[in-house]
Amino acid sequence: MSLTNEQIVDAIAEKSLMEVMELVKAIEDKFGVSAAAPVAAAAAAGPAAVVEEQTEFTVVLTNPGLNKVTAIKAVRGVTGLGLKEAKDLTEAGGILKEGVSKDEAEKIKKEMTEAGATVEVK
């Protein structure tokens, strides 16, 4: 029995954010690929290529710190997730926000650091 693409998309749409993140990680591991956009490959295409300054950043939670409750509240404030999703993301670590400006990334980093968490801006 073979699933159609529509059935696969519908099944993914029913999953929570954490389940989808776990699915992406499993696909990356199984097939040896990365879900990250290949931005650097275009810039390194030739010597005449102009190096562009990064305009979009990703904020990644690397460590929630000692006070998880404060970190969960901060994650909820930053992401707009519900309590359970924010708790799961805080405990597992991972991407808080993608495609944000440098100013917003720094604001998120400051807010999370004040909550005792460690974040990385990529």
UniProtKB/Swiss-Prot annotation:
Parts forming coiled coils: none
One annotated GO molecular function: mRNA binding
Gene name for this UniProt entry: rplL
Pfam families reported in the protein's UniProt record: Ribosomal_L12, Ribosomal_L12_N
GO annotation, cellular component aspect: cytosolic large ribosomal subunit
Sequence similarity: Belongs to the bacterial ribosomal protein bL12 family.
Organism ancestry: Bacteria, Pseudomonadati, Pseudomonadota, Gammaproteobacteria, Lysobacterales
GO term, biological process aspect, one: translation
Free-text function comment from the UniProt entry: Forms part of the ribosomal stalk which helps the ribosome interact with GTP-bound translation factors. Is thus essential for accurate translation.
Protein name per the record: Large ribosomal subunit protein bL12
Keywords, in A-Z order: Ribonucleoprotein, Ribosomal protein
Domain of life according to the entry: Bacteria
Subunit structure as annotated in this protein's UniProt entry: Homodimer. Part of the ribosomal stalk of the 50S ribosomal subunit. Forms a multimeric L10(L12)X complex, where L10 forms an elongated spine to which 2 to 4 L12 dimers bind in a sequential fashion. Binds GTP-bound translation factors.
